[in-house]
Amino acid sequence: DALERLELPVNLAKGVARIELLGNREVYMDRHCGVLAYTTENIDVNGGTVVVRFYGRELRLLVMTGQELRITGVIERIELVE
């Protein structure tokens, strides 16, 4: 496979969203495809192949660009919905 020959991580090469959780207070996500729903208790993000649902308290979309977003608050649960 061409991706293996280039030695690139498959998820990076195929544009899959990447999620980084910093404790239970902050989430960094890149390669997203937009926010679908936003309240202080629930944020749904289009991850390309899945919808990523963040549940918690006092959730806040701190930063959002075309490629990256950062969510703060008390993150209680993350769900991937196909």
Report the location of each language-model feature.
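N-terminal intrinsically disordered, cationic/polar leader segments
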Residues: 1-82
